[in-house]
Regions:
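Hydrophobic/aromatic residues within well-ordered alpha-helical segments
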Residues: 19, 62, 73-77, 98, ...
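Amphipathic alpha-helical packing segments from all-alpha helical-bundle domains
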Residues: 75, 83, 127-154, 165-168
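Short amphipathic alpha-helix in the helical subdomain of ABC transporter nucleotide-binding domains
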Residues: 16-19, 141, 163-170, 191
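Amphipathic alpha-helical segments used for helix-helix packing
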Residues: 106-129, 182
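N-terminal intrinsically disordered/low-complexity leader segments
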Residues: 1-18
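Helix-turn-helix
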Residues: 22, 26, 30-64, 68
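C-terminal peripheral helix-coil segments that are non-catalytic and often amphipathic
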Residues: 1-6, 97-105, 143-155, 171-206
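Hydrophobic alpha-helical connector segments
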Residues: 68, 72, 82-110, 166-170, ...
Length: 206
């Protein structure tokens, strides 16, 4: 009997998680189309097909949904790259994948409101919580870059010289390109030129 109850509880929890995921995926579609400022609970309700009361069991506001989307997005971002790091794939392969992912993201951002939504959130929510979230995301970006560099060091491809500073520089360039993408004035050539400059910063072994 206890096992049956446990099984039923697990099934209920799975259904609850599935519904929460559906809300977040639907919200992502809304934010990508409308950004954050113009998105409403009504938009999200219509997109996911869950009643207003059903959504409020999980989230109390658009901002709360957006933060959950942002957290999920942050966790999933560059999952492939992190897996390659864990598997010690050749350094250049990982670096190429990292740049390729950013290139696609930046070019897609021209027509995708999600990046705009992220910056709208940071510019309109001047709170300690939003500041902490932004710092956490920047730190995570820098950490991922530094972990890629460490693979290069371990494989004898690059020297362990000023890598923390270079990782920070990468982070600034990537964030700057993201802001430029919001204006719609970013080009493939601009992205490629900046990636080439970032590569030149690396202390390759001769």
């Amino acid at each position: 009997m206890a096992k049956k109850q446990q099984s039923e509880l697990t099934t209920a929890e799975k259904k609850k998680q599935q519904k929460r995921d559906l809300i977040l995926e639907s919200a992502k579609v809304v934010f990508s189309k409308k950004g954050l400022i113009d998105a409403t609970m009504k938009d999200i309700i219509e997109e996911c097909g869950i009643s207003r009361g059903g959504i409020y069991l999980y989230f109390r506001s658009v901002d709360e949904i957006f933060l959950a989307v942002l957290e999920q997005r942050s966790k999933r971002k560059f999952d492939d790259v992190r897996e390659m790091i864990m598997e010690q794939v050749p350094f250049e392969t990982i670096l190429n994948k990292y740049f390729s992912d950013h290139r696609k993201r930046l070019l897609h951002s021209i027509s995708d409101g999600m990046l705009r939504a992220v910056y709208e959130y940071y510019y309109t929510h001047k709170t300690e919580a939003s500041s902490s979230l932004q710092q956490a995301q920047l730190s995570e970006t820098k950490r991922t870059i530094h972990e890629i560099f460490q693979v290069g060091v371990q494989q004898g491809v690059i020297k362990d010289e000023n890598l923390a500073v270079i990782a920070e520089n990468y982070m600034f360039v990537i964030e700057g390109l993201g802001i430029l993408a919001l204006t719609g004035h970013i080009t493939e050539q601009t992205i490629d030129d900046q990636i080439a400059v970032m590569r030149q910063l690396l202390p390759y072994r001769e």
